[in-house]
Amino acid sequence: MASAVWGNAPWWSPPPPAPARPLTDIDFCSGAQLQELTQLIQELGVQESWNDGPKPGPDLLQAKDFVFSLLSLIHRRDPRFPPQTELLLLRGGIREGSLDLGPAPLGPYTRGPHYDAGFTLLVPVFSLDGTGQELQLDMRSCYAWLCLPEQVRGTSVREAWQDCLGPPVPGGRDWIHPTDSREGPRDPQSSVDQPHSDIIEPEAHESLEKSPSNVSVPESPQQNLTDIGFPSLSEETNDDVTKAADVSPGPQPSEAREAWPTLCPAQVAAWFFASLAAVAESLFPVPGAPRLVHAARHAGFTTILLATPGPPRRLLLFDLIPVVSVAGWPQGARSHSWAGPLASESSSFYLVPGGGGQTERPGASGWQLCFARQELALKARIPTPLLQAHAAAQALLRPLVAGTRAAAPYLLRTLLYWACERLPALYLARPENAGACCLGLLDELGRVLEARTLPHYFLSGQKLRAGDGASSLLGALALLRGDPARALRAAVEEAKAARKGGGLAGVGAGSH
């Protein structure tokens, strides 16, 4: 009897196997299905969307206004603080990679156990034109020095900042100046720029001359925070922060520029915290307004925690960092990206109190270059699936770096920019590739931790440092990489808890 056939095979043979699924559907390292990872990443994005929408909720707006009111009170107390200034508000705290401060002690705060959402606020206390002699950039590092002459426009700047002066610029270095500044010198008391924000564009730039509407100050500010249920404000001491000290009178104006004293970032950070603490101690709670429950200084910035009235009650973290705003663009800095030109007629950058991320720290008077404004513009051009992948990788990394000096969160953010330079935009924009992109970012971060350096995205030839904790973090990252699906499920549950608000441990009990 003739045998029937199934295709080219006898009828008794098993059917041919189904076409193999692409190898990219399975993660080789962990065996996880990329489709499942992508679904978890998308779910994580939905759960975290309460603080990521185009129209922030009233709790976030109230907290923002509360912080702006605090700053206006600082100006009333100390005229050195500019009455009008641009405030750049970034979503995510410094511990989540919003800024590069290098490996620095950032405190024990962890999103979830200690707060629901974090933000970074850049507060310019000084503004200058980068073409002047005051700014000195080191060609061999990411640092700069701000040298103060005796007078600027008839104002004794050096006398005004006497308690924040540092030694002259160290010798033996090659210096460059920013270029392409289209503006004249700007007085730090009269700088008013266009609004920029990562939360709500039209309202992020506020005049600090406005009367605060949700902060009350008693006529006799004798009340201490402890007396009204707030923990005392604390100041961490570490090797990266120096206390304000008596400074000898500066050189005469006729002396060479090399002898000019510098504006010390650590001293400025100490002054900023002391001013905020003095204002905070004079406050008393206002019904229906956010409540300041904690403030402390870490490295070069101040961290405050605000409890919103709710419902739901949320605890919001704000990292307030005093910065110098510089008009112009540094020579040798990247001028183009995958998204187009970076340097334009209105280009500017910031100087921030660095955490000592270089192998050889240039001294306590060195400010670190920061391109937060350009990073904000780049973020708007990154495909949404890649942003979701980065947010997921960031959530997985969060518990691993809590309480450490690791610079991994900002390294992960920089890898995001390099990925856009390297990979096709069509690939990054496909939603089904979010899982693969998340794993790719984690794998790249592992290689960076092993090498301990990563090329700086904006400054050619410069390196970002991973810090001393890179080895231990690399081991923890390898364990996480073995089961990314489980870690993502835990991150989703954490995001659900944060969405509900409240139930946060260790806040308001003086434990920070």
Curated annotation (Swiss-Prot):
Domain of life: Eukaryota
TM segment ranges: 268-284
Subcellular location(s) per record: Cell membrane
Keywords associated with the record: Apoptosis, Cell membrane, Membrane, Transmembrane, Transmembrane helix
InterPro entries according to UniProt: MAB21L/cGLR
Key word Transmembrane helix present: yes
Residue stretches of biased makeup (Polar residues): 210-226
PANTHER family in UniProt: CELL FATE DETERMINING PROTEIN MAB21-RELATED, TRANSMEMBRANE PROTEIN 102
Quaternary assembly: Interacts with CSF2RB; this interaction occurs preferentially in the absence of CSF2.
A GO CC annotation given for this chain: cell surface
Gene source species: Bos taurus (Bovine)
Biased composition regions of type Basic and acidic residues, renumbered to the chain: 174-186, 195-209
Cytoplasmic face residues: 285-512
Region span, Disordered: 168-258
Protein name (Swiss-Prot/TrEMBL): Transmembrane protein 102
